[in-house]
Amino acid sequence: MRRGGAALLLAAAFALGAQAQERAIPPDQLKSGSAFLGEDLRALQADEFANPGMLWVERGEKLWREPAGKKGLACASCHKEVNMRWVAARYPRIDSRSRKLLDLEDRINRCRAERMNAEPLRYESDELLALTAFLARQSRGVPIAVSIEGPARAHFEAGRTSYHQRRGQMNLSCAHCHDAQWGKRLLSETISQGHPNAYPAYRLEWQTVGSLQRRMRACLSGIRAEMLPYGAQEYLDLELYLAWRAQGLPIETPGVRR
């Protein structure tokens, strides 16, 4: 093959790659879910004394310092809070030992099992939500910055496919609402861009704190689609894709949502 032809093919490959990673919402138009709330709920989220999610953060801080498992270790035995400042903004990520994609909940449970010889915490349990909220609170204000390179690439692609896949009796995808219709009204609500940067979050409809996967399941229920069990690989892949499309938005945990 001539040099000019090879260069043309290479340029085309780069162009296709760039197009594949193109965001439906340009970075300068990214808006956190809090931007679609009324002034009262934005003020509630910003007030650390009134924000109901802070109750879970406070409980998580106690659990962080509390010994657990047969080794009698606490999370704080190994990790200093100052070193946790950036952690939540970088998850989901590939675990260097198992080479598996982990979200923050998985990371907590893996540390408990491998380092503390403690039982893993059940998904959506108050204990796991509290620890996750406490850790994510340390990253509040830090921009999301996940990696989709190397072994994370396949999970990113799977998450993107999942995001654009039509589902359920209503035959809708995540993109139909959160890419194409954001800012428009749906009954009494304004459709957000569907970013994960506030989770775990306190939702008024739940009257409690819930995880991002709980929110995903609620969306699936809303379009009458099958809900997978907590911790399913498809949810983890989708979490990575959602974090990538929210790159640059600051962590807001604990968020407040309707």
What spans do the regions from the language model cover?
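Post-cleavage N-terminal segment of exported redox proteins
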Residues: 2-5, 10-11, 16-57, 93-157, ...
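An amphipathic alpha-helical core segment
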Residues: 175-205, 209
